């Protein structure tokens, strides 16, 4: 077939240059399903983009952002709603498990507050998790204390007092994006999208390296870059609800996995924040 390739000893549907299924139509629907119904689908296409986690106490199902139709659904929602399972689990007497799910619920609520920026709330989440990790064992009382309005407000004020120069932020995100793109380049994935973005990232890295023999040109470039960043930040604001939905879904689906402990949660939160930073920077470029 013209649509299949051999991979890992199996014949699978070959994706296009943008790593998209060739059977998606302009409305992001499967033309096979439209024409013949969902009985023609493979097992992968039947479950995609759904994901299921099987915990000892219950199963959780969620939609994943790898499908463009899911992004469209989230874009229509002001805020996503997720089930609270901690109370049900606490009734079973499994305190250790229920408190981890309560922690996830607290973080989901924290990221749902549009009165602060996404970046502020990600920082607050990370600092709270660090403190909780250092003050184990994790208890419901400890969570209520660290996520209380007064504690979060105090933490937010402390974060706002930290000097975070925008150029340093751009430079770090630039390096992060280049580092995370290495594996995609090795696999030859998303090249049409990644190559021009990475070319710009490399240009910025070189310009900010302070190796120029003309300091005036450096200052002009940095000033122009900051202006572009400010304009970008304003253009991004209408998409904050969608980005919050994406991040909160990542927290619900990836923060707490079967057999996770608090250290795993802390590491997963770091990855989610890195993921957001790299997506934001690729959009900027």
Features from the language model and the residues they span:
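Short Cys/His-based metal-binding microdomains
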Residues: 25-75
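Charged, amphipathic alpha-helical linkers/stalks
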Residues: 69-154
